[in-house]
């Protein structure tokens, strides 16, 4: 295995492990909260901490060494999944939040890390995140719907995966540097202060920054904040807005509409593993993730520079699925399953093409920052979807019950 293949393989694993717990938790949403609670509650807990991390990360993450980040990711992921596999709903929610922090922190970190290894690393990461979807959802479906293992045991089995982050230490990280907030910022001033302290005889003077230096630190921090906001603003229209809207549409489908895309269990032509209504929800999630995996793995070979076109297509998918849930146009799940798979293809393609556009169009000196910052967009779209879904799913379900289709209230 040459160096490029090695980098691709490692980043593929990083992408898979970083996202797989997020996928497993969403796949288990119907099992965690039951049929009567909106599944977007789990989505909200699964995305809010991640979004907060991504929004605030550009202001502080540069000062945290990658080594420390790796250990934090492992701890948060493992402890979080142990909590999720517990019996208490409150403990499950805390565990989901911890796994979410790990996912958001990991995505920003590895996207920034890919800057040092160029497009090869980003391709591996993108494919790996797509692989996380199909691995997480299909393995969970296999364990619970086919092998019929207990839900809690199935969730607990995923705690071993985060230790794969240790492969980071097998990378050539000599080229990675940790810069201070700015060349004239706090770190430089502290180093100068420490150097001057060696020339003094008084302990108090050795640890105290002068007023001038403190003022310089404050001014430098303000300048850094302003420049960060300016850089973020430049990324909104070309990259963040279309990516955010794609994720808004697809997660409304996945977590708010798909739990209501149900069919009678005694219908002819149902897949043999549709033994319960929750099996339909889990299957939709697996098909979506299969589409994401395929498109994230191949999208770099079929480039799409117009990101808003992908957003429009995903919006059309949302309209079609809402119509099906509301009117019950199709009476067999197969067309819906194909549509969900296609939805995944669009979502994965949008993700990869967004970050490839950043690599191709953003200046080298701003590329590392931009890759991490644009990752805010997908989480923001998912967060909005979670809020909207809290009302959308119950509305559709109540309508179905009133028209003689009570399946959304059944297990």
Swiss-Prot record:
Keyword Lipid biosynthesis: no
Entry keyword Transmembrane helix: yes
Main subcellular location of this protein, as a coarse class: membrane
Transmembrane residue ranges: 41-61, 79-99, 127-147, 149-169, 281-300, 307-329, 334-356, 371-391
A biological process from GO: L-arginine transmembrane transport
GO-annotated cellular components: fungal-type vacuole; vacuolar membrane
Residues making up the signal peptide according to the UniProt record: 1-29
Topology within the bilayer: Multi-pass membrane protein
Location(s) in or outside the cell: Vacuole membrane
Key words of the record: Amino-acid transport, Membrane, Signal, Transmembrane, Transmembrane helix, Transport, Vacuole
Cited function: Involved in vacuolar transport and vacuole pH homeostasis. Also required for cytokinesis.
Family statement drawn from the similarity comment of this UniProt entry: Belongs to the battenin family.
Protein name according to UniProt: Protein BTN1
Organism name: Candida glabrata (strain ATCC 2001 / BCRC 20586 / JCM 3761 / NBRC 0622 / NRRL Y-65 / CBS 138) (Yeast)
